[in-house]
Amino acid sequence: MSTKSMIRDVELAEEVLSEKAGGPQGSRSCLCLSLFSFLLVAGATTLFCLLHFGVIGPQREEQSPGGPSINSPLVQTLRSSSQASSNKPVAHVVADINSPGQLRWWDSYANALMANGVKLEDNQLVVPADGLYLIYSQVLFRGQGCPSTPLFLTHTISRIAVSYQTKVNILSAIKSPCHRETPEWAEAKPWYEPIYQGGVFQLEKGDRLSAEINLPDYLDYAESGQVYFGIIAL
C-alpha cells in the first residue's frame, strides 16, 4: 500500500467517525483518532523517506569514510600512481659534521636516503635515468658579530651534463647577514642566515649535480636537518 492510499484511508475513517460522534464523548473520541491519524501519517512518511533515500534497504557499494568507493577508477588510479612513484630515483643527503672547514655530503647518516639508482660520487649526485627532477638544497650559516669587510654568503647548485661536460650553475643565491661592522665597544651578537633553493629540471642519465658554498666555516651543524641536498624524480 502506498503512502497516498494510507493517508486517504485515514481521512475517510475520520469523516465516518465524525458523523457518528456527538457530545463531549464524541469530541474526545475524535481527538484520540486525530492524534492516532497524525502518528500514522508521520510514520508512513518517515518510512517512505528512508526507503527513497536508501537509508534502509539494499546495502550500497562499500565506501571509505568521506571518500569514493574503494573500487572506483579514481582510487585505482591513485594506487597505480603510488606504486609507480615508489620505483623512481630519489636521494637525500646531509652534511658530514665530521668534516669541518668543508661541505661534504653523506648518505649514511640518519634520515639520509639513496634509492633506485642514484649514486653519490666525488661529492656529487649522479642521475640514473632521463626525466624531470626536483632538485633542492638548504644550508644554514651562523656567525658572531660582523667584520669590517663585507660578508657575502653564497649557495650554488651546479650541473655537469653528459652532453657537454661543462659545469653550469642552475640555482644560485647570495646573502649578506651584516650591513655594518660591529663596533669594538659593542657586544658581538650572533646571527643566522638560512638559504634554501629548489627547482624542476630536465636531466639526462649520467648528469652530475653538486651543491656548494663559499664559506664553509660559517656552516651551522648544531642541529640535524639544517644542511641537506637532494633530488626526486617526477
Curated annotation (Swiss-Prot):
Keywords: Cell membrane, Cytokine, Disulfide bond, Glycoprotein, Lipoprotein, Membrane, Myristate, Phosphoprotein, Secreted, Signal-anchor, Transmembrane, Transmembrane helix
Ranges per topology, Extracellular: 57-234
CDD domains: TNF (cd00184)
UniProt keyword Electron transport, yes or no: no
GO molecular function: cytokine activity; tumor necrosis factor receptor binding
Residues found modified as Phosphoserine: S2
Xref: PANTHER family: TUMOR NECROSIS FACTOR, TUMOR NECROSIS FACTOR FAMILY MEMBER
Protein name as catalogued: Tumor necrosis factor
